[in-house]
């Protein structure tokens, strides 16, 4: 591959590429040049009002935490992570951060939509959880059992490559209580995703090896080296994940021998190089990036420029804009079709979602007298767009499903 093509391809592994290329699809929507979606900007205020109301209801103090996996460990007035990690209190802040990153990575990878019929009965608390919260608590219980540790119950709160490679769908099904009456979307693909993570950790030694161990948590040591004047740029977290874990995604795309991950194609994005038409989203990688910020901050990192990361192109955020009629589908028969996540329609939907989240963030800050420091996009997603999308979905559809039918394998959405 020519050097220019290599550079252009690697540039796709940045948050700037996500934002720029999604904007190009949005510009086509502004001139009504998209094949599947129409932009109804006159209805945009409805989405803004929904999110403002959601933030006020969820966080009346105005102090909104980041949208991250850690929120799903906080339920019913309890912090399940703090309860599970009490044995780590004697460890250094560095080792605590490694353990948190271990958990965040595997839990995010297991977080794609569970489906409407699955739930997790947590025997320890006596509580039952579904969807993202259920997947979070189930993954935490599996983590603290030592199933991901090569040292087993002797040192359970860690994730090692060899244990990930040994994980089977049967183990996952048992721990996640999957049965014919409690089906989980994409069970086998979730197990394969963790198997692939184990393989990738061993390949990417420069990022994930430390003292003879291969752990997601060793990303902490890699990011230590990326600090400049005591601060870490948020984009460095995403770039490290994309470059280090690019081979994990089974649905990910490649350009020659470079894994470019969660991307689609659209004719509105024009380039005179090998990346012509490519639209990157990196949804799970950015969700993972948001979920690593707090462990890094707790370990003493100063993380700058959070808003370089983009909003997440997933079905709750995207559903908010369809259900608020900010965007509409030109052909209503598309609501009856099950759509592949790489389909042109879904690519348009996801690209519009990224840009509309940026525009919504501007309006939220304007109306709450905040700025990108006091109300970063990560907090607006939490406050926020994701829960507003889920709320309106339940108001409009009995099972809270997204407005579009999706062929989810449990690896992206």
Segments (PLM) and residue ranges:
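Extended, well-ordered protein cores
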Residues: 2-299, 306-333, 337, 344-413
């Amino acid at each position: 591959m020519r050097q220019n093509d290599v550079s252009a391809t690697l540039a796709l592994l940045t948050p700037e590429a996500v934002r720029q290329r999604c904007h190009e699809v949005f510009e086509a929507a502004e001139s009504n040049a998209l094949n599947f979606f129409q932009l109804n900007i006159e209805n945009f205020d409805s989405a803004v009002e929904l999110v403002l109301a959601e933030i006020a209801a969820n966080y009346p103090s105005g102090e909104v935490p980041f949208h991250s996996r850690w929120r799903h460990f906080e339920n019913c007035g309890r912090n399940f992570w703090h309860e599970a990690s009490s044995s780590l209190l004697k460890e250094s802040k560095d080792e605590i951060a490694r353990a948190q990153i271990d958990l965040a990575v595997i839990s995010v990878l297991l977080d794609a939509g569970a489906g409407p019929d699955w739930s997790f009965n947590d025997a320890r608390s006596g509580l039952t959880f579904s969807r993202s919260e259920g997947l979070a608590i189930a993954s935490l219980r599996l983590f603290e059992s030592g199933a991901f540790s090569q040292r087993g119950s002797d040192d359970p709160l860690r994730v090692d490559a060899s244990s990930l490679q040994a994980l089977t769908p049967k183990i996952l099904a048992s721990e996640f209580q999957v049965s014919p009456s409690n089906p989980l979307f994409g069970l086998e693909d979730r197990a394969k995703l963790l198997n692939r993570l184990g393989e990738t950790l061993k390949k990417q030694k420069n990022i994930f090896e430390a003292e003879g161990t291969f752990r997601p948590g060793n990303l902490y040591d890699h990011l230590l080296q990326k600090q400049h004047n005591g601060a870490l740029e948020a984009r460095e977290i995403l770039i490290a994940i994309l470059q280090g874990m690019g081979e994990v995604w089974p649905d990910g795309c490649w350009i020659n021998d470079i894994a470019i991950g969660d991307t689609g194609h659209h004719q509105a994005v024009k380039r005179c190089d090998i990346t012509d038409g490519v639209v990157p989203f990196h949804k799970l990688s950015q969700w993972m990036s948001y979920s690593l910020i707090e462990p890094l901050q707790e370990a003493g990192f100063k993380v700058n420029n959070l808003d370089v990361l983009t909003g997440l192109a997933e079905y709750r955020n995207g559903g908010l804009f369809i259900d608020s009629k900010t965007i509409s589908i030109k052909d209503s028969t598309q609501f009856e079709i099950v759509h592949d996540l790489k389909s042109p329609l879904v690519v348009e939907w996801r690209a519009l979602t990224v840009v509309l989240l940026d525009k919504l963030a501007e309006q939220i800050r304007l109306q709450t007298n905040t700025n990108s420091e006091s109300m970063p996009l990560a907090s607006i997603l939490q406050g926020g767009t994701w829960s507003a999308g889920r709320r309106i979905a339940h108001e409009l559809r009995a099972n809270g499903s997204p407005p579009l039918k999706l062929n989810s394998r449990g690896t992206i959405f």
